C-alpha cells in the first residue's frame, strides 16, 4: 500500500526551485532513507510530506497521503509523527521531561489546552518513554538532559500518538554511541510492529542496517532511488557529492571515506 504519492510537482522557496518535477511514492511497512547534501531539497520534501507547503506547479495526480488529497483533511497529517532537531528549542529548561511528552497530546483528538490528561494518556506517554529508554529520567528538568537524552524524548513525544508513519529528520545528530545503538534497537521494534519509517539524513554512514530503500536527492530532484546496496555505491555517491569517495560495507552499515 502506498501511503504518500506525488507526481511531477515543483515547489519554490523564494526565488529558488527547491523541488523540481518531483515524483515519489512511499509504501507502508517499508523503511526508507532520504539522503542528500545540504540544499538538496530534503527539508522541503519534509514540509511537503507533512502538508506545510504545497506545490506551485504540478502535472498528473495531486499529492496524496493515505489515499486522500494531502490538504483535504487535517486529521490525515496527525497520522504522521515527525521528529525535527529544532524542536528542542521549544521547551523551557525547567520543564519536566515527562511533560514534554504529555504536552504533545494537547490539541489532539479534539482536546482543548485546559483538559487534564487521563490515566490512558499517562500510560501511553510512559510506554513511549520506556521504548526510548528514558523513563528512568522522566522527572528530571529538560535543561539538565544531555543532547542525546533530549533527542530520545523528542522521539517519545512523536510515538505517544501511535502514528502510522514516523519521520526522523537527522535522527543521529547529537546522539552518543550508546544512544545511537538504542535508537537502532527501537527501529527494529517499530518495524516489527508494522510501522513505516522515513529517515532523512545528509550522511550515508548514518543510515542503519534496517533501512532497505534509499532515495537520493540533488538540486531538488530525485537523483537515485532503489535498494540500499544498489544506490550507495562509490560511483553514485561520488556523482552525488562531487568528490571521490571510497565505500565499504560492514554489518549492513555503509562506511564512506575520501579517496
Tell where the protein language model's regions lie, with residue ranges:
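Conserved ABC ATPase signature
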Residues: 115-116, 141-145
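ABC ATPase nucleotide-binding domains
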Residues: 238-259
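Conserved structural motif at the start of ABC-family nucleotide-binding domains
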Residues: 4, 18-21
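Helix-to-loop junction immediately C-terminal to a conserved catalytic motif
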Residues: 50
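Conserved catalytic motifs of ABC-family nucleotide-binding domains
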Residues: 162
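Conserved ABC ATPase "signature" region
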Residues: 102, 117-137
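Catalytic Walker B motif of ABC-type/P-loop ATPase nucleotide-binding domains
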Residues: 166-170
Amino acid at each position: 500500500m502506498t501511503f504518500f504519492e506525488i507526481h511531477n510537482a515543483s515547489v519554490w522557496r523564494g526565488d529558488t526551485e527547491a523541488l523540481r518535477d518531483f515524483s515519489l511514492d512511499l509504501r507502508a511497512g517499508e523503511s526508507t532513507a532520504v539522503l542528500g547534501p545540504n540544499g538538496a531539497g530534503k527539508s522541503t520534501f519534509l514540509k511537503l510530506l507533512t502538508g506545510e507547503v504545497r506545490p506551485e506547479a504540478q502535472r498528473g495526480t495531486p499529492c496524496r497521503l493515505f489515499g486522500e488529497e494531502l490538504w483535504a483533511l487535517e486529521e490525515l497529517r496527525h497520522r504522521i509523527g515527525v521528529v525535527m532537531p529544532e524542536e528542542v528549542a521549544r521547551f523551557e529548561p525547567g520543564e519536566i521531561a515527562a511533560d514534554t511528552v504529555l504536552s504533545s497530546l494537547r490539541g489532539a483528538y479534539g482536546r482543548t489546552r485546559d483538559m487534564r490528561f487521563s490515566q490512558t494518556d499517562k500510560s501511553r506517554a510512559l510506554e513511549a518513554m520506556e521504548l526510548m529508554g528514558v523513563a528512568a529520567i522522566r522527572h528530571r528538568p529538560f535543561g539538565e538532559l544531555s543532547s542525546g537524552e533530549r533527542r530520545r524524548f523528542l522521539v517519545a513525544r512523536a510515538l505517544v500518538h501511535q502514528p502510522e508513519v514516523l519521520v526522523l529528520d537527522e535522527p543521529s545528530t547529537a546522539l552518543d554511541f550508546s544512544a545511537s545503538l538504542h535508537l537502532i534497537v527501537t527501529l527494529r521494534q517499530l518495524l516489527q510492529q508494522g510501522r513505516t519509517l522515513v529517515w532523512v539524513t545528509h550522511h550515508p554512514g548514518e543510515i542503519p542496517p534496517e533501512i532497505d530503500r534509499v532515495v537520493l536527492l540533488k538540486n531538488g530532484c530525485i537523483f537515485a532511488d532503489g535498494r540500499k546496496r544498489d544506490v550507495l555505491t562509490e560511483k553514485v555517491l561520488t556523482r552525488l557529492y562531487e568528490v571521490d569517495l571510497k565505500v565499504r560495507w560492514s554489518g549492513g552499515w555503509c562506511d564512506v571515506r575520501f579517496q
